[in-house]
């Protein structure tokens, strides 16, 4: 039985599209459907392996809607997304049915962040960064149990070493 009461629908557009990452965090993979968020752009972040979105008025971001997220699961995901993101309610269109749906998603707090650039690609991430990201996510969960728990940001900073010349993470 799932803990928590309310059921939320959550639009994910980066690493949380990967079932293995979601399973590590929630101990299950919720039902999900493909969706498009209009009026936003998905950015790369210099020195990081995960993306973010910001409203731009014209763009489209492809992703998935995770269905039936509980209060406890949403709390876990809020903690994972950490202080860099705000959770907002947005409208997406489901790819298969064109149905419009109000969902939660995580939006980058700092719209003027100088580290924002380009377009983040999920398939490229899966090929190059997924394995290390899953390992770092497991480390985040381990660190949460410590008396002085580390945030996801702190865990990932210590897990990934950065090649500052090209902004790509290196294995630790």
UniProtKB/Swiss-Prot annotation:
The entry's keywords: Acyltransferase, Transferase
Q: Quote the Pfam families the UniProt record gives.
A: GGACT
What does the record give as the active site? 81
Task of the protein: Putative gamma-glutamylcyclotransferase.
Chain positions recorded as substrate binding sites: 13-18
Q: Which organism is it from?
A: Arabidopsis thaliana (Mouse-ear cress)
Q: Which GO terms of the molecular function aspect are on file?
A: acyltransferase activity
Q: What induces it?
A: Down-regulated by biological stimuli.
Name recorded for this polypeptide = AIG2-like protein C
EC top class, as a word: transferase
Q: Which domain of life is it from?
A: Eukaryota
- Where is it made, tissue-wise? Expressed in flowers, leaves, stems and roots.
Q: Which family does it belong to?
A: Belongs to the gamma-glutamylcyclotransferase family.
SUPFAM superfamilies, sorted = Gamma-glutamyl cyclotransferase-like
Asked whether the keyword Transferase is assigned, the reply is: yes
- What EC number(s) is this enzyme filed under? 2.3.2.-
């Amino acid at each position: 039985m799932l803990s928590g009461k309310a059921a939320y629908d959550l639009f994910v557009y980066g690493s949380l599209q990967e079932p293995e990452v979601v399973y590590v965090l929630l101990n299950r993979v919720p039902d999900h459907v493909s969706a498009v968020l209009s009026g936003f752009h998905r950015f790369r972040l210099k020195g990081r392996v995960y993306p973010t979105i910001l409203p731009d008025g014209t763009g489209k971001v492809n992703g998935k809607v995770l269905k039936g997220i509980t209060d406890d699961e949403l709390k876990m995901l809020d903690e994972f997304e950490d202080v860099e993101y705000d959770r907002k309610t947005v409208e997406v269109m489901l790819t298969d049915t064109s149905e419009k749906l109000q969902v939660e998603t995580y939006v980058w707090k700092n719209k003027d962040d100088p580290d924002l650039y380009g377009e983040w690609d999920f398939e490229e991430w899966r090929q190059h960064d997924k394995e290390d990201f899953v390992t770092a996510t497991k480390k985040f969960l381990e660190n949460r149990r410590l008396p002085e728990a580390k945030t996801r940001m702190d865990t990932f900073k210590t897990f990934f070493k950065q090649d500052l010349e090209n902004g790509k993470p290196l294995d630790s």
